Amino acid sequence: MNKQSWLLNLSLLKTHPAFRAVFLARFISIVSLGLLGVAVPVQIQMMTHSTWQVGLSVTLTGGAMFVGLMVGGVLADRYERKKVILLARGTCGIGFIGLCLNALLPEPSLLAIYLLGLWDGFFASLGVTALLAATSALVGRENLMQAGAITMLTVRLGSVISPMIGGLLLATGGVAWNYGLAAAGTFITLLPLLSLPELPPPPQPLEHPLKSLLAGFRFLLASPLLGGLLTMASAVLVLYPALADNWQMSAAQIGFLYAAIPLGAAIGALTSGKLAHSARPGLLMLLSTLGSFLAIGLFGLMPMWILGVVCLALFGWLSAVSSLLQYTMLQTQTPEAMLGRINGLWTAQNVTGDAIGAALLGGLGAMMTPVASASASGFGLLIIGVLLLLVLVELRRFRQTPPQVTASDS
């Protein structure tokens, strides 16, 4: 990568076939999950007219993901990671089929939506952890920043496309189409993943799973990179259906709300060329997080939905910068034998923030207007973020030696 370039270098997709297969599978998977992500809150909102119920579904799914990430972290450090990935994807597809069949019933079951959310949240997180742990083996640690940015770009571009498609499907065909296409896409991802080489974990002594997990906790707590970053602001999506009523948005326009954050994040990934050369990544990560919280606070105050979309896109861009820096610092400083557990714990931190935020925002939405709920969450997190900036001294002062630019990077 040219040292002076802000643009992302995509050469890994050409030089590493296994990473290219993961890229393709992840893109298809994210598009499929995006269709699901639009359908579930809209269906629950239509059935219950309650933001609290929408928040509960996100919280339950987040809780299942937390457990799955804990289990998946241990499994990824003990067992062949390719098998874990394939198992997780296949079982998720079964859950999506269940959601589709439930939506086709004359009176869909709300309980079934909650239970299938638990199922999909648990098994999806198993695959996420194993994929993250296998990344360094697929591309080499020297390429982790580049791989992380490409991965983020894959996720965000898929997340931009799928909500808009999902919104159009909701307006024309109903939620069953979203669920059915999500299931089909999930099973299609198995095809490129089957071409992956075996991904065995590094040799290490066998120990009790809980003891193994505690070892990961101890390492993470001893790391100066424990940022304590809160991601609750991204849980504002539980208010989208209610805010759509406030802004008098159509079903198709709701999709733009869901697409705004990943669009901003995609721009952040595309312009991440210089992030690897940041001398103080910890400080940059904290400042970008503060900016993202401010964007969420302003989001709910916008008089028109299009201005709200701009605020969400800004949040996505700043969040992308923060997430990419945190990802790279953790991956490069974590021993290979602990990558599964550390990635599981790190991702669980984000999922926990989203789940707690969804529950709080759902409750606020029941007591306050959606506009007030969104603004209160953003400005509240901004205050907490300023305190974190002052308290997390080691992270704020953390310095790294910028990587040397090689001929292959130019």
From Swiss-Prot:
Location(s) in or outside the cell: Cell inner membrane
Positions on the Periplasmic side per record topology: 43-55, 105-109, 178, 234-250, 302-307, 372
GO MF assignments: enterobactin transmembrane transporter activity
InterPro entries registered for this protein in UniProt: Enterobactin_exp_EntS, MFS, MFS_dom, MFS_trans_sf
Domain of life from the UniProt record: Bacteria
Membrane-crossing residue ranges in chain numbering: 22-42, 56-76, 84-104, 110-130, 157-177, 179-199, 219-233, 251-271, 282-301, 308-330, 351-371, 373-393
Cellular component terms per the entry's GO annotation: plasma membrane
Annotated membrane topology: Multi-pass membrane protein
Gene3D superfamilies: MFS general substrate transporter like domains
Stretches assigned to the Cytoplasmic side: 1-21, 77-83, 131-156, 200-218, 272-281, 331-350, 394-410
Keywords, comma-separated and alphabetical: Cell inner membrane, Cell membrane, Membrane, Transmembrane, Transmembrane helix, Transport
SUPFAM superfamilies xrefs: MFS general substrate transporter (SSF103473)
Family, similarity comment: Belongs to the major facilitator superfamily. EntS (TC 2.A.1.38) family.
Function in brief: Component of an export pathway for enterobactin.
NCBIfam families associated with the record: PRK10489.1
Name this protein carries in UniProt: Enterobactin exporter EntS
